[in-house]
Amino acid sequence: MADGITYGIIFPFRQSVTGKYLALSEETNEEIRSNLIFLLLTRKGSRYYLPDFGTRLYEYIFEPLDGETFDSIKTEIQDSVDKYIPNLTIQNITIEPYVDSEPSLGELPSEQFDIPVYRVPGANTEEYTAKVKIEYTDNTNAFGSREFVIINI
């Protein structure tokens, strides 16, 4: 584009103001945030010409939520960002496990739904996940503003 502004598609995808096209980012911080989310949620090996692009976060879904797994997740994120988003500096990665205290679909009476609700006998009803908070600085910003992204795995 001739005006010197770089444009990128905002992730997660949404419609533009006119509703005809995908929304584009015109601000650097918005574009970097979209690029970071896109990088984190892309599985390694899913891009034909860039097989190393992305992360292996999906592989950690059923791993134990302990320090060793958290260190592996941090390393995975840091290595991918260093390689594919060089204008971003990660300040801190915080990972914390939590248990969803809301009732799961299997605990609710099936009369409330039009579809049958199934429950696996003997299965644990608590769903364990981890919350990953990534604090980063945009190196292209003259003021060095800090931003963060939170994803759940």
Report each predicted region and the residues it spans.
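Immediate N-terminus of the mature polypeptide
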Residues: 1-75, 79, 91-92, 96-153
